[in-house]
Design a protein with these regions (language model features):
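Core SAM-dependent methyltransferase catalytic element
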Residues: 152-166
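A short, conserved alpha-helix within the catalytic core of class I
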Residues: 78-90
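Conserved beta-strand signature within the Rossmann-like core of class I S-adenosyl-L-methionine
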Residues: 96-107
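Class I SAM-dependent methyltransferase SAM/SAH-binding core
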Residues: 6-56
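A conserved beta-strand element that flanks and buttresses the S-adenosyl-L-methionine
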Residues: 70-71
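Short conserved loop adjoining the S-adenosyl-L-methionine
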Residues: 56-64
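Conserved Class I S-adenosyl-L-methionine
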Residues: 114-141
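Conserved glycine-rich SAM-binding loop
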Residues: 3
Length: 166
């Protein structure tokens, strides 16, 4: 999830659109509560924070926005297997939806050598995500989404948790 909304606040204060509504879904009650408290300190920023579960994805909106940008950043990683309808639900955010998912899934698509092996072992050892690439592939096949580009293994963290972008 979005945690306490750090990425949303950084985008807004880093020059993000002032007219946009910044919406964050977070699994933990404490994360949602902290994000809501921080949002009160940012009165010029339009925000909404809600409970979101990657295992049972549901968006709380009554109707879709005209345009939506949906992104995840090392959020899905902590859910061993996301629901196969994850993308089906997320595209309901808007009439036109652009997505960007910086998640550690590169090893699921291609073995690039020792780093991929270490990363896969790390993910399995921690019971972290092992099906993002498959759910993405199925959503592409069903034409729920269309892929423009995938960038594998873009950065390395000290614990070999390498992010890829879809």
């Amino acid at each position: 999830g979005c945690g306490y909304g750090r990425n949303l606040f950084e985008i807004f204060y880093g020059g993000g659109p002032r007219e946009a509504k910044y919406i964050g879904g977070e699994f933990t009650k404490s994360g949602v509560e902290i994000a809501q408290k921080l949002a009160k300190k940012a009165p010029k920023m339009k925000t909404e924070f809600f409970h979101f579960n990657h295992l049972e994805p549901k968006l709380p909106f009554k109707k879709p926005f005209k345009r939506a940008f949906v992104f995840t950043c090392h959020s899905i990683e902590q859910v061993m297997q996301i629901n196969e309808n994850w993308f089906d639900e997320v595209v309901k955010a808007g009439e036109f939806v652009r997505g960007a998912h910086l998640e550690p899934f590169g090893f699921q698509l291609k073995n690039s050598g020792p780093l991929s092996d270490m990363h896969k072992d790390f993910m399995i050892q921690n019971s972290w995500n092992i099906n993002f690439a498959e759910v993405l592939r199925q959503a592409l096949e069903r034409k729920i989404i269309k892929d423009e580009q995938i960038f594998l293994e873009m950065g390395v963290t000290p614990d070999v948790n390498v992010g890829s972008l879809a």
